[in-house]
């Protein structure tokens, strides 16, 4: 019954709208998630911070605001990810534009950024670092690394590539939005369009979900591009291609870091060893799952 609780036509206060929106959203999700989503929608439409919403809880919505909120709320009730509705998503220290042509950046991927930054500490602070981000999407990984290296006043060169032209454009926009315009983004199917060159680091969050995985019919991934999610060979086809071809683009002593599914660590480690990488290690994400495997190229 709550699902059909429509918003009143009478002007609602911020507090009233939040209460009703949370009630409707709670039918399909936890009350805590419902509160987060309702607050995000209200802040987005009113252009107010959460603190301002709380401080002025009795402020009345305009008719136009109320109508727009209802449209956005309906989209969320139908399962569309909040990031696609708002067109933006926070990642690391960045505020990123997102669209349905790209994956939504997730907290799990911050584990990849953290691991790369940890390994970067092994390099001299005077060294000019070269980094390649494969399948860059929104540019999240490349830009997060750029933000940290800029703050550290390191000399670096970062290239992000993606097969989808719209993703490359979005990544460039995110670079401008976050004042990180020194990161280069280009269209390429993995390494195919890259000129011959060598990198200290190659990082990637490639497609790694198996084609028949039942999770593809659940949650946010229903709305995300399948090409960015799914890979053949039980989700390992693109990972294997990257591990094999990266050897041509890797400096001696350089590292390749790959995000993967929580049950794929053993298989990814085996692929690294098959193609003669050394010092293979797997890192846990914030939830304690095996999420990132990296290896060193020592040839």
Where are these regions (language model features)?
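Non-catalytic accessory regions of SAM-dependent methyltransferases
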Residues: 1-46, 51-54, 58-61
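Class I S-adenosylmethionine-dependent transferase superfamily signal
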Residues: 116, 145, 220, 242-246
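Active-site beta-alpha loop architecture of Rossmann-like, nucleotide-cofactor-dependent enzymes
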Residues: 83, 209, 263
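Conserved AdoMet
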Residues: 42-119
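Mobile active-site "lid"/loop adjacent to the S-adenosyl-L-methionine
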Residues: 208-238
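Conserved SAM/SAH cofactor-binding pocket of Class I
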Residues: 111-215
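Residue-level signal for inorganic ion chemistry
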Residues: 41, 79, 109, 141, ...
């Amino acid at each position: 019954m709550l699902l059909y609780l429509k918003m009143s036509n009478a002007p609602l206060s911020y507090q009233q709208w939040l209460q009703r929106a949370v009630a409707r959203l709670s039918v399909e999700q936890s009350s805590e998630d419902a509160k987060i989503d309702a607050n995000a929608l209200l802040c987005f439409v009113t252009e107010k911070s959460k603190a301002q919403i709380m401080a002025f809880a009795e402020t009345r919505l305009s008719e136009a605001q109320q109508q727009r909120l209802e449209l956005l709320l309906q989209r969320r009730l139908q399962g569309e990810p909040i990031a696609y509705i708002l067109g933006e998503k926070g990642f690391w220290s960045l505020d990123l534009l997102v669209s349905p042509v790209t994956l939504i950046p997730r907290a799990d991927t911050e584990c990849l950024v953290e691991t790369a930054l940890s390994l970067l500490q092994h390099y001299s602070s005077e060294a000019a670092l070269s980094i390649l981000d494969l399948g860059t999407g929104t540019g999240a990984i490349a830009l997060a690394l750029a933000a940290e290296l800029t703050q550290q006043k390191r000399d670096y060169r970062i290239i992000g590539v993606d097969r989808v032209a719209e993703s490359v454009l979005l990544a460039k926009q995110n670079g401008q939005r976050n004042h990180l315009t020194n990161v280069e983004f280009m269209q390429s199917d993995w390494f195919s369009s890259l000129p011959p060159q060598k990198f200290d680091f190659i990082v990637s969050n490639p497609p790694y979900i198996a084609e028949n995985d039942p999770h593809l019919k659940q949650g946010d991934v229903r709305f995300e591009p399948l090409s960015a999610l799914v890979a053949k060979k039980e989700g390992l086809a693109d990972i294997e291609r990257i591990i094999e071809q990266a050897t041509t683009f890797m400096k001696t002593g350089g590292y390749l870091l790959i995000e993967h599914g929580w049950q794929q660590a053993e298989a990814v480690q085996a692929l690294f060893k098959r193609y003669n990488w050394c010092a293979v290690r797997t890192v846990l994400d914030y939830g304690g799952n095996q999420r990132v495997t990296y290896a060193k190229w020592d040839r």
